[in-house]
Amino acid sequence: MSSNLSTKRIEIVVEAEKLEELICLLIEAGTKGYTVIKKVGGLGLRGTRNPDDALWDEGNTFVTLACKEDQVVRIVQGLSPWLKKFGGMCLISDCERLESPAVPY
């Protein structure tokens, strides 16, 4: 396990129409990389969202990233008030990242 790096995982679910704003916020906080999965569904405060529903154009978007502890602090400072205004969900957890030739942070 010595080739693993301790990091934080951030997982965010937001409405697709807010994705661009979210990405700008993450980049301003120093994020070097992220993954986006579009048209995700589930059950939340707004009821059930089915990504296969033809009437549901945009849907929700899932964004995940791994970063160091100091980056989490900067991301949370910008993200917390943003989520209160626009809604969404953010989970932060400890994780281990396999060491690779190019770690973006």
PLM region descriptions:
Residues 1-105:
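Positively charged, small/polar-rich N-terminal and surface patches that mediate targeting and assembly
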